[in-house]
Each structure stands twice: as C-alpha cells, then as structure tokens.
Amino acid sequence: MSEKNKLPKGIIVLKTLSMPENINANGDIFGGWIMSQMDLGGAILAKEISGGKVATVRVDSINFLKSVSVGDIVNCYANCIKIGKSSIKINVEIWIKKIYSKPLGQYYCAAEAIFIYVAINKTGQPRELLPMSII
C-alpha cells in the first residue's frame, strides 16, 4: 500500500492540539513532545488491556516521518501487537490533520513506534496480566 493510501492502524486513544510552547529551534513541533503523546496513548491502551497500572519499559524503532506544525490536530492511534505474561507490545501511530497550515485538511502519519509496557502492582513490581476486560 502506498503512503498516500495508508490508513491508521488501531483505535484512536488520544487527540490533542499542537501548541506554540512545544516548538523546536526550527519552528516545528519538538519530537520529544510527539514521543510523549505516543507514550500517553500507548499507555492508555495498555492500562485498558491490563486492567491496572503499567510502566513503559522500552520503545522500539521510533520513526519520525513528517514534521508537525503549531495548530495541527494530533491524533494518536494504538493497537496491541502481542501480550506476554506481564508485558504488552503496542504499535502507536501519530496522525496529523492540518488545520492552520498548508495543505489544509491533509491527514498523514507523522510518527510511528512500538512501545512495550509491563503490568505492575502497587509497589511497582511486574505482575501477571489479568484477563482482558474490554476491547
């Protein structure tokens, strides 16, 4: 499938607006902010799957594909790739809808990554996953 025909994978787990306080020296949205939104979105899905607390333990193969501008709508999609004894592997994508910058209305994938979360107990130790209660 060509990039032009690519569709988001998974469900939308987070939607926000890129703001001026998140720009880098080039005037684009800082990649670290994008990564933090991806971690939040992935953690939401991981918490729903685990039925409790999770901790991010690793990020694999993060790719920043296109820049993001101030005022763009940032959509975070996530889907579960694998469930282990205590770990959850989540594919996360950031899709951008252009509102204030050209071309208006364009929708594209700006970043993608694999996040690994571990279900944890009240003391922060890994715990066995509970059966999925939703999704």
UniProtKB/Swiss-Prot annotation:
**Is Membrane given among the entry's keywords?**
no
According to its UniProt record, the EC number is 3.1.2.-
Keywords in alphabetical order = Hydrolase
Taxonomically, the superkingdom here is Bacteria
The record's GO CC annotations read: cytosol
Q: What sections of the sequence does the record tag as coiled-coil? A: none
For this protein, the record's InterPro entries field holds:
Cytosol_ACT (IPR040170), HOTDOG_ACOT (IPR033120), HotDog_dom_sf (IPR029069), Thioestr_dom (IPR006683)
Residues covered by the HotDog ACOT-type domain = 8-123
A molecular function (GO) term: long-chain fatty acyl-CoA hydrolase activity
Top enzyme class:
hydrolase
Biological process terms in GO annotation: acyl-CoA metabolic process; fatty acid catabolic process
Stated family: Belongs to the acyl coenzyme A hydrolase family.
Q: What is this protein called?
A: Uncharacterized acyl-CoA thioester hydrolase BU274
Species for this entry: Buchnera aphidicola subsp. Acyrthosiphon pisum (strain APS) (Acyrthosiphon pisum symbiotic bacterium)
Q: What is the lineage of its organism?
A: Bacteria, Pseudomonadati, Pseudomonadota, Gammaproteobacteria, Enterobacterales
